[in-house]
Every structure is written in C-alpha cells, then in structure tokens.
Amino acid sequence: VVVENFSPGTIARLGFGWDAIHARCPKVVMASISGFGQTGPGAGRTAYDLVVQGMGGIMSVTGTADGMPTKYGVPIGDIGAGMFAAYAIAAALVRRGTTGEGQYIDVSMLGGQIALLTYQAASYLATGEAPKAAGNAHSIITPYDAFPTKDGYVIVAVGNDSLYQKFCAALGMSEAATDPRFATNRDRVANKAAMYEHINTAMAPLTTAEIVERLDVVGVPCGPISRVDEVFANEQVQFTKQRRTIQ
C-alpha cells in the first residue's frame, strides 16, 4: 500500500506515480489524498482544513441561525479525508484478495466534507432548499437540543413520542405531557417555542447532574456538555481506557 498527499502531479514528476508503480507491482494499492482531487478545474488549488470546511458546506450548517458560519472545533476536513482514505484502502485490499489486482484511490478533503453532510445534503437534494444553521437543535426532531440548567447545560435527545412521555414524567412536566400541542413529534416541532418554555421552567432549579440522573433512570438519552478535562475524568472513559500511556 502506498499513501501520498503531495500536490496533484508532484509524485508522478518524481517518478513514483500510479502508472510507474503499478507497472512494477500490479498488486499495489495506492491512495492519493489532496484538497480537491487529482483532476478537474480546482485540482491545483491549495487547501487547508478551514478552507475546505467552508467550501464543503459544513460551516453553513454549524453554529446559530443569527451568527456567522462556524467551523468545527476539530479539523474535520483533515480527519474526514484520512478516514475515507482508510476505508477505501481496506476495501481495495479485500478486492485484491479476490482478484489479485491493485487499485488507485483518489480521495479529496472536499469530497470528504460533502460525504459528511449526510442528511443535510439529502434534504437539499430532495427539496431544493439549502439547510441553515440551527444551533444544537435537530431540524425534524424535538426536544433534541442543549438546555440551560442551574449550573450549566444538558443535552437531551427525545427521539420519539414514548421517550417524550418518559421525559415529562422524569421532570414533573405533567401539563406538557398531556398538552395536545405536544402530543406527537410533528406537533412538538410546530409548537417548539411553547414546549421549550415548559422545559426551561422545569430545568431551571435543577443541576445538570440531577437532570441526567433522573433521565437515565427512565432511559431518556441525555448527557452533560463536558470540557476536555471532564471527558478524561469520566468513569466510563477511564474504564474503557480511552487514554493510554505508551512507554
């Protein structure tokens, strides 16, 4: 397997392009990772993570509706290209095991960002309307958002009507549980602002930990918004050894 991320055309000029390597070793799997692809009108452009996040649409759906477009907190443009290259290499190796043939793989940072648009891209392709940033909320499921608590914020992901009833019971929201405006997810989406008033009132006197404890008991997906130090202090993270010291 050969992996390279020179500017398009560079490795061929050095004598190690696909044609040269494949001629010597027909079984070779070669992956080229670049900003915009090996061919096409934009192939020669220079890419950095932030540039590709902007061009790939990710920033347009990240952040709040009334704020400026926002980049991910990690270099998802770089990471995405590497991940997709790894998947493609693994698939090429499986194919080689069957056919005995090598394969050339062209992965771009821009292409990776487009693939990560997932349902945002599907929504546009189905409706013709470009999705907009919506903060932490889900576009078609609610309550699915970050809510303020007595000492911070809590994430709640109420994915169906059954979970909504459990959510209301855990937080003592009996009125919201029976209000016909919130009976189904479609109703809740249509009356989101009114529902949020009930949720904010119920959560205001409770700490994040208290809310998580209540919702965990009834099986409602939830969690705190952790700082990086809090992530590594989490007992599940420690148990699964996500942090390891290598000698």
Question: Where would I find each of the regions flagged by the language model?
Answer:
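A structured beta-alpha segment of the ubiquitous adenosine-cofactor-binding alpha/beta core
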Residues: V1-A23, A204
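Residue-level detector of anion-binding/catalytic polar loops
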Residues: V1-V2, K27, P221
